[in-house]
Amino acid sequence: MSEKDLKKGTTTLGLVCKDGIVMATEMRATMGNLIGHKTTQKLFRISDNMALTVAGLVGDAQMLARWLSAEVKLYELKHGTKMSLRAASTLMANIMNGRRYMPFWVQLLLGGNDSEGSHIYSLDAAGGSIPDQFQTTGSGSPFVYGVLEDRFKENLSLTEGKKLGVRALTAAMKRDSASGDGISMCVIDSNGFQKVSPKEIEKIETTLAA
């Protein structure tokens, strides 16, 4: 199968804020020079306290999201408690490392809250797992990092985090041809996973453009 036949995701980000995390993606999937889809899901709810963003092959990404979601649910049923972000990150890293010679063509961000606080982990195709205060993946990540390095600060409010996420992804969509077609975003705080509505994202975009 040639590169032009493969549907690939592109730009995602995650931010650790004072009261939780913000995760966001754009929605374009490309097949070589062709825009394959304009409403691609790259942000997955794994559990009430955990979410995953994906960049890379859509098929690999969707399968890994289903796999992790099932493992987390089984853990909760067996142990009667939520899986920690560190444990989920280690599990996902081990799965990916086991395929390092025939790797999944993805880069993942795993984020959420647990008893130890808020976390964002970046996971690569070889099984590397790195926590940080902010992370980005995909072809538009250089543009996102430019914005985040300049504007991110510790203890951002979730409102500030949502605005920064929209600003950073907008910068990527303006310059990276493989990124575009809108933004999907969630927050995870003490109330659990919450999807940010398209109307709220549009309002933030309007405010930033003013």
Locations of the language-model features?
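Long, low-complexity N-terminal extensions
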Residues: 1-210
